[in-house]
Amino acid sequence: MATVISMIPYPFLPANNGGQKGIALFNQYFSQHVRLIGITVEQNDNTLAGYNTIPLFSASRLRYINPFYIHRICRIIRKEKASHLMIEHPYMGWMALIITMLTGIKLIVHSHNIEALRFKTTGKWWWKVLWLYEGFIHRKADNSFFISDADRDYAIKHYHISTANSLVATFGIEWDQPPSEEERKIAAWNVRQKHNISPEEQLLLFVGAFKYPPNFEAYCIIRDKICPALNDIGMRYKMLICGGGLEKEQPSDPNIIIAGFVDDIHLYFKAADVFVNPVLDGGGIKTKVVEALGNNLSVVSTFNGSIGIDKNICGGKLTIVEEDDWALFAHQIREATIGQSHIPVEFFQHFNWKYITAKAAKIVISDAQPDKD
C-alpha cells in the first residue's frame, strides 16, 4: 500500500467549518485507500483523525517559514518509506520542494481554491505575489488536486500546469442518498418549534462563518435586498441565519432570525424549504451548497455561489440567478418553495467522499508502483 505524508499546518480537528471538513473528510476517506500519516499542529484533537498523526507544527505563525521542520519531516519520510508528500494549499510549498529534493518523494498539492484569486476578490494588494508563487508551486508538483473543474481549468490556462498531472477532487458529503421525507418532517418540526416558526411560513436558510468577508457581505444582501424583496411580493417566511460572527447583529426585520452557531447543522438542512446563497466573492466550491443539495434541499444561488457544481446533476434543485437582480432572486425563492424535484443519484456519485478519494488514490497508487522493465 502506498504511503502518503500529509502536511496540515493548521487546526482542523474538530472540523467545524467547510474548509476544515474538506481536509478532515478527504483525509479520513483517502486513508481507506492509502497508508496516510498526517503531520499536524499541536492544537488538533488528533484522536478524531482516523489515521496516524504526528503533532509536529507549533501554533506560531513562523511555522510557515521555519526551516528546522525540514530535517524532521525528511526523517519521517525515510522511516515510513513514503512515496508521496501532500500539502494543503501552496503556502508550505517552498518547504515541500526542498524536502522532495532531499528525499526524492513525489509532491501533491491539495488545492481548496485558487488562493491568489480568493485574496484578490477580498481586496488584498499582495495577491499578485501569491499568484506568482502559487503557480510556481503547482508547476513543480507531480500532481495537483483541485476542488472544481473551474479551478483546474484556470490552473492549466494561467499557471501552465500539465493536464495529465492534475485532477478534480471536489468537496464531498458522507451520505449517498437524500434523507427520507419522514426525516425531513421530524427535522422541520424540531427546528420550527425551537425558533417559533409557524407551519404557514416558508423556512429559508443561509449558513456561513461570518467573520469571513464574503459571507458577511452575503448576509448584508439578505438583510438589505432579498428580505425586502420577499416582503414586497407578500411571501410568508422566516430567514434563518446559522453560523458564528453575527452576535452583534439585531436586524429590524422580524422575518430574519439569527440562530448563531448550531450544534447540528444537518438538522437545519433537512428542515429548511429553500437554501439561499447570495455569495458574490470568494474562491472554490461553496461547501454549504453541496451539503444543502445532498439533503434534497432546493437552492437559489448567485453564479459565484454555485461555481464547481454542475446543474445537470442536480435534478432541477439548483437555480442560478445573475448577481444584483435581487427582485428576480426573491421570485426564484418563491418558485423553489413549490418545486417537487428530487436530487438524482448522479449527484451522489460525483460528490460522495468514497468516489472522490478513490479517484485520487488511483493516481497515487499508480505513481507508487515501481516501473517494470
Task: Indicate where each model-derived feature is located.
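Conserved catalytic-core segment of nucleotide-activated headgroup transferases in glycan assembly
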Residues: 22-23, 28, 173-252, 258, ...
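Membrane-proximal helix-turn-helix segments that form the acceptor-binding/catalytic region
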Residues: 71-75, 101, 125-147
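A charged, aromatic-enriched C-terminal amphipathic alpha-helix characteristic of glycosyltransferases
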Residues: 338-367
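N-terminal subdomain of nucleotide-sugar transferases
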Residues: 1-46, 80
